[in-house]
Design a protein with these regions (language model features):
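Short, hydrophobic/glycine-enriched beta-strand segments
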Residues: 1-8, 147-148
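Active-site-proximal alpha-helix that buttresses catalytic centers in soluble enzyme cores
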Residues: 6-71
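Short, active-site-adjacent cap segments at secondary-structure transitions
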Residues: 12, 59-60, 81, 153-155
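Short glycine-rich phosphate-binding loop at a beta-alpha junction
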Residues: 47-55, 139, 144-148
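Alpha-helical structural signal in soluble globular domains
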Residues: 65-69, 156, 160-164
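Phosphate-handling substructures
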Residues: 67-124
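GST superfamily/GST-like fold recognition
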Residues: 151-155, 181-183
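Domain-level recognition of soluble alpha/beta enzyme cores
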Residues: 162-187
């Protein structure tokens, strides 16, 4: 299975904030720019106009434009960014240092109150990927899957695709893909 996944456009006014599943606004021009990139990519690669989206606005709004251009959009909550629970939407500076230290030192298993751990994110990503592979049913020539996703989800999928272990400490977490950039993952 081939997965082409674009990171959503950069949200507005989020500098210094912990943003996971907080629904934040994105400039309409940036949403349109990503929709244009995806449409051009699909045309050049001669792919079906089918794309998967997270229910968060920074992904979903791209799908709104693409659906007006003939794309079939499928929304899946499993594609959402990591859930930071009570941290979500707060300034990083306002989150207790001890909690952040605990998270950084037990990166795979620590979950903020009412949030999810990195292990839980990985489980969610792997379940979604396995469902897509199952749907393909072992076809020799499967149709690539297109997604507009989030940095944490993309990093988790990359780590899964390369059969690496889940990072145990924050320093092992890879650098995030740039906004509007796509990654190709092979499973």
């Amino acid at each position: 299975m081939i997965l082409y996944i674009w990171r959503h456009p950069k949200p507005m006014n989020t500098e210094g904030f912990c943003i996971g599943q907080t629904d934040v606004k994105v400039d309409k021009r940036k949403i349109k720019r990503l929709a244009n990139k995806i449409e051009r990519f699909v045309r050049i690669k001669q792919l079906p106009k089918i794309i998967w989206l997270s229910p968060l606005q920074r992904s979903l709004k791209v799908g709104d434009i693409l659906s007006q251009r003939g794309f079939h959009c499928q929304v899946s909550p499993e594609l959402s960014e990591i859930n930071f629970g009570e941290w979500d939407g707060q300034l990083w500076a306002q989150i207790e240092k001890k909690e952040i230290d605990d998270w950084c030192n037990n990166f795979a298993n620590f979950a903020p109150n009412n949030g999810e751990s990195l292990q839980q994110l990985f489980n969610r990503v792997e379940e979604w990927l396995n469902a897509r592979i199952f749907e393909e049913g072992g076809k020799i020539e499967s149709i690539p899957i297109l997604v507009v996703g989030h940095a944490g989800w993309i990093n988790a999928a990359k780590i899964i695709a390369t059969s690496q272990d889940i990072p145990k400490v924050a320093a092992e977490w890879p650098r995030s893909v740039n906004y509007l950039q796509y990654s190709r993952l092979d499973f």
